[in-house]
Swiss-Prot record:
SUPFAM superfamilies reported for this sequence: Aldolase (SSF51569)
Highest taxon, organism lineage: Bacteria
Record-level Gene Ontology MF annotations: tagatose-bisphosphate aldolase activity; zinc ion binding
Entries under CDD domains matching the protein: TBP_aldolase_IIB
Keyword annotations from UniProtKB, A to Z: Galactitol metabolism, Lyase, Metal-binding, Zinc
SUBUNIT field: Forms a complex with GatZ.
Cofactor(s) the record lists: Zn(2+)
Protein known as: D-tagatose-1,6-bisphosphate aldolase subunit GatY
């Protein structure tokens, strides 16, 4: 079985002191880059998609691609629902074969967040599907969900324990100063808060908004308990900029098998760097 849940991946990372990167993909080419690079480096990775990605590519198509590529490379892969908010949508995708879910109800008041997440956990655990949830809110935009920086708030360590115990989640996404998108200047991450959360919660912790973070910051968060690192914008930027550059330099290009190669190469460099930063090479 090559398509797996993230639970064992993240538990192994927690014990081993490294992190598993979750790369947001959008199509065949971006998935090829992630899987081929991970297989070459023998690194565990998570293939993540927002609701918009699953709508764009099709749930059955993405599942078929992940399954086929995992078997081809003899490399275990997890396909993960990133920032999904609707129970019915999650349930449908789980029944289709998805084995890892993030239910994002972080915009709701604390008690309602617990209630919404627990409903998803109770359903997903019947299918051996791992569940991630978020406490606190990141600024920036992910798919159609936009959070003003002024409305973002950090995870409360004591609430984090209550939240984890009340919901039964398998991993917890925390807000410690990162944001979705790229940073205009280096963010000031609250490492002390992360250390306190780690003392209150023994679950694998997840860091969203890692695009553009320094190697030093990523590795410090891993030392303090982060087991999953989410990267999306940095991949899109590398891919799209290289594609634009190629087409500008080669306006006669019409064959996507040719003009997509430079985009894939640029994205591959980012994937390789993130795997190195996470310390997960050779851990698959």
């Amino acid at each position: 079985m090559y398509v797996v849940s993230t639970k064992q991946m993240l538990n192994n990372a927690q014990r081993g002191g490294y992190a598993v990167p979750a790369f947001n993909i959008h199509n065949l080419e971006t998935m090829q880059v992630v899987v081929e690079t991970a297989a070459n480096l023998h690194a565990p990775v998570i293939i993540a998609g927002t609701p918009g990605t699953f709508t764009h590519a099709g749930t059955e198509n993405l599942l078929a691609l992940v399954s086929a590529m995992a078997k081809h490379y003899h490399h275990p892969l997890a396909i993960h629902l990133d920032h999904h908010t609707k129970f019915d949508d999650i349930a449908q995708k789980v029944r289709s074969g998805v084995r890892s879910v993030m239910i994002d109800a972080s915009h709701l008041p604390f008690a309602q967040n617990i209630s919404r997440v627990k409903e998803v956990v109770d359903f997903c655990h019947r299918f051996d599907v791992s569940v991630e949830a978020e406490l606190g809110q990141l600024g920036g935009q992910e798919d159609d969900v936009q959070v003003n920086e002024a409305d973002a708030f950090y995870t409360n360590p004591a609430q984090a324990r209550e939240f984890a115990e009340a919901t039964g989640i398998d991993s917890l996404a925390v807000a410690i100063g990162t944001a979705h998108g790229m940073y205009a200047s280096a963010p000031a991450l609250d490492f002390s808060r992360l250390e306190n959360i780690r003392q209150w919660v023994n679950l694998p912790l997840v860091l969203h908004g890692a695009s553009g973070l320094s190697t030093k910051d990523i590795q410090q968060t891993i030392k303090l308990g982060i087991c999953k690192i989410n990267v999306a914008t940095e991949l899109k930027n590398a891919f799209s900029q290289a594609l634009k550059n190629y087409l500008t330099e080669h306006p006669e290009a019409t064959d996507p098998r040719d003009y997509l190669q430079s985009a894939k190469s640029a994205m591959r460099d980012v994937v390789s760097k993130v795997i190195a930063d996470c310390g997960c090479e050779g851990r698959a």
